[in-house]
Amino acid sequence: MPELEYPKQPYSTVKRLNDRARYSLETIHGIINSSPFINVAFQDSTSPFPAVLPMIGQMGSFARPSADLGDVLDLYLHGYVSSRLMNLARTSRDGGETGIPLTMSATILDGYVLSLTPNSHSYNYRSAVLFGYATPVVDQAEKLWAMELVTNSVVPSRYQNTRNPPNGAEMQSTSILKVKIKAGSAKIRSGEPHDDKGDMNDEEVREKTWVGVVPAWTQFGEPVAGSYNRVEKVPGYLEEWRVEGNEERRREAYEAVKEPVKGEEGT
């Protein structure tokens, strides 16, 4: 079955270093869902400047909960009921589309790429940008489902291991935005440093300048119990997520040092 891709739109097509571009739903959704924060940009008519907020969110499908990352998914964003973005989303219509237009992005750093000259330095990274229209979720069943989805995106199974479901006050004070995605793109860099031919032929520079990649990843430390914690041991689901997550991110960072297959990724 062919891999689904987002359509290339003028606002979503990668122009510079476009050999690094990806439009695969699976790739883009994977980057978004692996990031602890999603940067959400919107325009408020009361301000001369676009607003950008770091938010917590996750891609999923209420209609098809078993859908995988390569399927068509919505982005669910979690926020306070009376925040500026939530208020705008309740009343916004744009060009016939229902909801407020949003641009959303996420980036994962995999390494520092150190070259012979400052101009050739880079990062190994995975970034994604999505464009869509957001409306508040009003159906209570979908809202509860989305709250569980977002909570478990922070720590898997955390929702089931807390007092749940949310009480009435919590439901009233929390809003969930559902973003229907119109387009998206990803940009990925992996591999070693690459320098200009002139610098590569400069033996003096090459003799004194270390070049290579410093892999980088998010590392979770040992959990520290809260002052009113009464659970003697760190729960197994939490420790498993921490240990396995650390190892997975470490593996990905070192994997990114390898040169990409020609024609697959830019450098």
What residue spans do the PLM features occupy?
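Residue-level preference for beta-strand/loop junctions
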Residues: 34, 49-51, 98, 126, ...
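C-terminal edge-of-domain segments
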Residues: 1-11, 138-267
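Short, structured beta-strand-loop surface elements
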Residues: 65-74, 80-146
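An N-terminal domain-cap segment
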Residues: 2-79
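Residue-level recognition of well-ordered beta-strand positions that form the cores
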Residues: 41, 58, 105-107, 133, ...
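A general structural signal for short secondary-structure junctions and capping/turn motifs
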Residues: 29-31, 67, 92-96, 167-171, ...
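Short regulatory "switch" loops immediately downstream of catalytic or recognition motifs
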Residues: 43-44, 59-65, 85-92, 192-194
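Structural beta-strand/beta-sheet cores of well-ordered domains, especially the beta-sheet scaffolds
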Residues: 36-38, 102, 175-177
